[in-house]
């Protein structure tokens, strides 16, 4: 959890307590869920190795709910992941990075906001997880990033899967961007789930 995100969320909760206690409560409950889901990952060995996709989504869902309270009608979200893929092996924190990038560089700077979708499917024997947004798209983002997050994903994919793990970034036909991580599909084995 990025410190900047955490402090902004706490400041938003503080403000909403005065003006809209119900929304403050929703945001607070989602922050608690986000911290509960992400703290075990932060305490673990930190090897960056695979976990299961369901665990990754348990961090993403409350994160998106917090953003929906902050951005109000400007953010619409959907997660399309078949139940059978929740136990599939997937590298930790990669989906979170893609979601953060989509919001920070595509959706937040766009005055009317947009839609963010997370989708998982099996394509040619690989688990493909995509994060698509209808944000500003390539070359239009108001906040130019350093590219460290995407470079980190590429490096970790190379270390974990060699040439069998990929990150592709493409223009979304609906406007915005689609980022897809593809890794060999396999259900997670043992006690890591």
At which residue positions do the language-model features occur?
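Hydrophobic alpha-helices of bacterial signal-transduction systems
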Residues: 185-193
């Amino acid at each position: 959890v990025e410190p900047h995100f955490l402090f902004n969320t706490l400041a938003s909760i503080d403000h909403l307590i005065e003006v809209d206690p119900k929304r403050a409560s929703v945001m607070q409950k989602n922050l608690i869920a986000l911290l509960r889901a992400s703290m075990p990952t932060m305490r673990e060995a930190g090897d960056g190795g695979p976990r299961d996709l369901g665990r990754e989504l348990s961090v993403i869902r409350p994160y998106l709910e917090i953003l929906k309270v902050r951005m109000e009608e400007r953010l619409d979200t959907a997660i399309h992941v078949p139940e059978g893929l929740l136990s599939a092996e997937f590298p930790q924190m990669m989906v979170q990075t893609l979601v953060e990038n989509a919001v920070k560089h595509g959706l937040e700077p766009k005055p009317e906001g947009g839609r963010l979708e997370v989708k998982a499917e099996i394509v040619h024997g690989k688990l493909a997880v995509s994060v698509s947004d209808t944000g500003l798209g390539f070359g239009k983002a108001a906040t130019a990033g350093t590219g460290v997050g995407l470079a980190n994903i590429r490096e970790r994919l190379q270390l974990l899967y060699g040439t069998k793990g990929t990150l592709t970034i493409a223009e979304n036909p609906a406007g915005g961007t689609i980022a897809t991580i593809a890794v060999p599909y396999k259900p997670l084995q043992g006690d890591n789930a």
